């Protein structure tokens, strides 16, 4: 996990990780492959999935339905097309699975993304990525704006995914969330990423020091 106070480079880091900004050669690799020049679509094809902090306009298209947003997150539309034609019944089935599993409060998967509350849209976006069982999922502020019960559901889903062998990277301002979910913790401060904190040796005191601009390594 990556902890840090807002405004210390989290947005820029996420843009690099999801492919919206290029990175220098061999700085960013996945499964031994240099992905620095790959865009988001190409990275999704490698089974890298993302939940950005900004919901509308970044994580979801406001004027599209939940079904349409579900389809957009699939780089190859796997199982959702037949002979180049969208199978909307299958798309809706995936959407309804997310709505049910993550308790998304909406009358229908045909509702526009912008009609959902921030918390419900967050649950839909997280669920949309998790049901893909990705090799890697990067989530920024996974439970921002959701109620305690829904936050626990999202946390348990992330833990379950990790238990199945997926890599999970969480970027969060919520230190309690980072501490409860993450085995390795780094701190982002003033655009610099610390080494992993030895929780047994240094623990919370070291993380707190780094978050206010202490020595990064």
What are the language-model segments listed below?
Residues 1-217:
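Glycine-rich phosphate-binding loops of nucleotide-dependent enzymes
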């Amino acid at each position: 996990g990556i902890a840090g106070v807002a405004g210390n480079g989290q947005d820029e880091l996420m843009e690099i990780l999801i492919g919206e900004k290029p990175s220098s050669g061999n700085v960013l690799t996945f499964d031994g492959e240099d992905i620095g020049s790959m865009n988001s679509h190409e990275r999704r094809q490698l089974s890298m999935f993302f939940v950005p902090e900004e919901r509308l306009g970044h994580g979801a298209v406001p004027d599209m339905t939940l079904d349409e947003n579900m389809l957009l997150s699939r780089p190859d539309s796997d199982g959702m097309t037949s002979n180049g034609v969208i199978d909307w019944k299958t798309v809706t089935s995936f959407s309804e699975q997310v709505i049910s599993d993550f308790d998304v409060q909406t009358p229908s998967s045909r509702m526009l993304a912008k009609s959902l509350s921030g918390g419900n849209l967050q649950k839909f976006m997280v669920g949309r990525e998790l049901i893909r069982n990705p090799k890697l999922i990067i989530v920024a502020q996974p439970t921002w704006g959701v109620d305690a019960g829904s936050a626990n559901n999202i946390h348990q889903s992330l833990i379950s995914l990790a238990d199945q062998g997926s890599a999970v990277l969480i970027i969060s301002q919520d230190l309690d969330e980072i501490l409860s979910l993450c085995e390795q913790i780094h701190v982002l401060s003033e655009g610099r990423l610390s080494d992993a904190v030895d929780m047994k040796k240094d623990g919370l005191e070291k993380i707190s020091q780094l978050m206010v601009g202490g020595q990064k390594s």
